[in-house]
Amino acid sequence: MSRIGKQPIPVPAGVDVTIEGQSISVKGPKGTLGLTVAEPIKVARNDDGAIVVTRPDDERRNRSLHGLSRTLVSNLVTGVTQGYTTKMEIFGVGYRVQLKGSNLEFALGYSHPVVIEAPEGITFAVQAPTKFTVSGIDKQKVGQIAANIRRLRRPDPYKGKGVRYEGEQIRRKVGKTGK
């Protein structure tokens, strides 16, 4: 049995879970999220009201999907109750970010400012010209937007300039030695 998959997912008060066949919908104080679980995996509620994810047999594919499905459903419940936030920071002379409406405008050393529009369900917040956060209820969407922003100017291994996650350690390289 999967160590992760066999654990029931507690449903906090104020969260409404609807299970119809392979699709599950979770509604909470921050919004509504849905998921379609892969075919052999079954999702149900137990007597305590918690969500239980089960698999029909110990086939390799089903074992893999068991833990994955349980984690994805757990992420839905966490998303509609607490939400997800990714903190990011910018290093480099003249590199900065500012909020323009609901969009982010970056100055990253290019000849033009780079504007990132906020997709539906994602909010941006700027704490300082070099620190900002990406927030939302969908963990996958928040992570993907943060990765796309980081890709605008990846951290440089020689000088450390660029956009990075807060607390991310950049592996530095030694430059050429002069004669």
Swiss-Prot record:
Top-level taxon in the UniProt lineage: Bacteria
A GO CC term assigned to this protein in UniProt: cytosolic large ribosomal subunit
GO molecular function, one term: rRNA binding
Keywords per UniProt: Ribonucleoprotein, Ribosomal protein, RNA-binding, rRNA-binding
Pfam families associated with the record: Ribosomal_L6
Gene Ontology terms: biological process: cytoplasmic translation
InterPro entries cross-referenced by the UniProt entry: Ribosomal_uL6-like, Ribosomal_uL6-like_a/b-dom_sf, Ribosomal_uL6_a/b-dom, Ribosomal_uL6_bac-type, Ribosomal_uL6_CS
NCBIfam families: L6_bact (TIGR03654)
Family: Belongs to the universal ribosomal protein uL6 family.
Main function: This protein binds to the 23S rRNA, and is important in its secondary structure. It is located near the subunit interface in the base of the L7/L12 stalk, and near the tRNA binding site of the peptidyltransferase center.
Subunit organization: Part of the 50S ribosomal subunit.
Protein name: Large ribosomal subunit protein uL6
Taxonomic lineage of the native organism: Bacteria, Bacillati, Actinomycetota, Actinomycetes, Mycobacteriales
